[in-house]
């Protein structure tokens, strides 16, 4: 007989610095509301993201009826990767009139490769167009 499936009671989506999850907000209150062991999650998340320090890594936490949980790591947000590639702190407040930085098409393709599994694109060219659109909306010029 197949094992019974656990009943899902919640899905939590968070964006946390890699290797730096702690019980303080926003992690603690979000998990505490679902009755999840916060320290257990923090230790597991920090261990899983240790090699990605310096990036914000989104995570999807599935909470089950017995208060156990699974989590799935996503790729860092395209905006954060673009800012890192352009060497900027933040995007433009008025992106269509004031450009704040430049990235090459090669950098855009590299970011698209990184994000490919999370993007809704069939091939790398379509993924690169999505990333280039994000860059334009941040006031970053794509060259090439």
Swiss-Prot record:
HAMAP family the UniProt entry points to: Ribosomal_uL11
GO molecular function: large ribosomal subunit rRNA binding; structural constituent of ribosome
Signal sequence annotation: none
InterPro entries the UniProt entry points to: Ribosomal_uL11, Ribosomal_uL11_bac-typ, Ribosomal_uL11_C, Ribosomal_uL11_C_sf, Ribosomal_uL11_CS, Ribosomal_uL11_N, Ribosomal_uL11_N_sf
GO annotations of cellular component type: cytosolic large ribosomal subunit
Known role: Forms part of the ribosomal stalk which helps the ribosome interact with GTP-bound translation factors.
PANTHER family in alphabetical order: 60S RIBOSOMAL PROTEIN L12 (PTHR11661), LARGE RIBOSOMAL SUBUNIT PROTEIN UL11M (PTHR11661:SF1)
Coiled-coil residue spans: none
GO biological process: translation
Similarity-based family: Belongs to the universal ribosomal protein uL11 family.
Gene3D superfamilies named in the record: Ribosomal protein L11, C-terminal domain, Ribosomal protein L11/L12, N-terminal domain
Entry keyword RNA-binding: yes
Protein name: Large ribosomal subunit protein uL11
The species this protein was found in: Corynebacterium glutamicum (strain R)
Post-translational modification: One or more lysine residues are methylated.
Alphabetical keyword list: Methylation, Ribonucleoprotein, Ribosomal protein, RNA-binding, rRNA-binding
SUBUNIT field: Part of the ribosomal stalk of the 50S ribosomal subunit. Interacts with L10 and the large rRNA to form the base of the stalk. L10 forms an elongated spine to which L12 dimers bind in a sequential fashion forming a multimeric L10(L12)X complex.
């Amino acid at each position: 007989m197949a094992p019974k499936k656990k009943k899902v009671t919640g899905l939590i989506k968070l964006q946390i610095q890699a290797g730096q999850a702690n019980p303080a907000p926003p992690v603690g209150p979000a998990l505490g509301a679902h009755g999840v062991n916060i320290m257990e999650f923090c230790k597991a998340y920090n261990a899983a993201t240790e090699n990605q320090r310096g990036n914000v890594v989104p995570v999807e936490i599935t909470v089950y009826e017995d208060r156990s949980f699974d989590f799935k790591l996503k790729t860092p947000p395209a905006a954060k990767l673009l800012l890192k590639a352009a060497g900027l702190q933040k995007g433009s407040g008025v992106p269509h009139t004031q450009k704040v930085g430049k990235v090459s098409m090669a950098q855009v393709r590299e970011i698209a490769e990184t994000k490919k599994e999370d993007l809704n694109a069939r091939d790398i060219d379509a993924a690169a167009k999505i990333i280039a659109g994000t860059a334009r909306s941040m006031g970053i010029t794509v060259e090439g």
